[in-house]
Design a protein with these regions (language model features):
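N-terminal accessory segment detector
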Residues: 1-148, 153-170, 188
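Active-site helix/loop of acyl-thioester processing domains in fatty-acid/polyketide metabolism
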Residues: 166-184
Length: 188
């Protein structure tokens, strides 16, 4: 998005002319994940909210590197476990939010009988818009109780590069927490 596309409204610079204008205009629109559709930048208050009216922050690669390096300095090798636990708690909370949002957004009573890939894509779309990366879900071993997820363009891995060890502990925790709630079984 270029600055030429951003409109100034009074003291607020917003990608939309009014906060959540597109959501108000198209309440049943499900394909709202471009930058200009998904985020509402309110410069007068210094906030960024998304389509679901959740607060977001923008961070630089230096912030990600500093956060992880600082955590490793403070707690050493336990930093991976700590990030995993943070991700797991986040995943559990996000599953509760997602279940409520999804059923309301799409008008379903329950998603236990829906196509799992449909549900998962609806869950991950906001993460893509927020910069958490694209994914590929491999369900070829589902009959044995396995699902494999490959993350591409992860902000964490891209920022840190190849450091010779796993770095996406928060993602692993996020998936464990979300899927634990989804299937009602602890996967952590």
């Amino acid at each position: 998005m270029s600055l030429a596309q951003v409109k100034t409204i009074g003291t607020s610079t917003d990608i939309r002319s009014d906060k959540y204008l597109l959501r108000q205009k198209y309440p049943q629109r499900h394909f709202h994940y471009s930058l200009k559709d998904f985020f509402s930048f309110q410069t007068n208050s210094g906030t960024i909210d998304d389509w679901n009216e959740s607060r977001n922050i923008l961070v630089s690669e230096n912030f990600i590197i500093g956060l992880i390096a600082g955590l490793e300095e403070e707690v050493g090798d336990a930093s991976g476990v700590l990030m995993y636990n943070i991700g797991q708690q986040w995943g559990q909370e996000d599953a509760k939010f997602f279940r409520s949002w999804f059923l309301k957004e799409y008008g379903y009573d329950d998603f236990s009988q829906l196509n799992l890939m449909y549900v998962l894509e609806a869950w991950w779309w906001p993460f893509i818009a927020q910069g958490w990366g694209n994914w590929e879900v491999d369900m070829s071993d589902q009959k044995n109780g396995f699902m494999f997820i490959n993350i591409f363009d992860s902000a964490v891995a891209r920022t840190l590069g190849d450091v010779g060890k796993p770095v996406c502990h928060i993602y692993a925790g996020l998936f464990a927490g979300f899927f634990s709630d989804l299937i009602n079984k602890d996967l952590g």
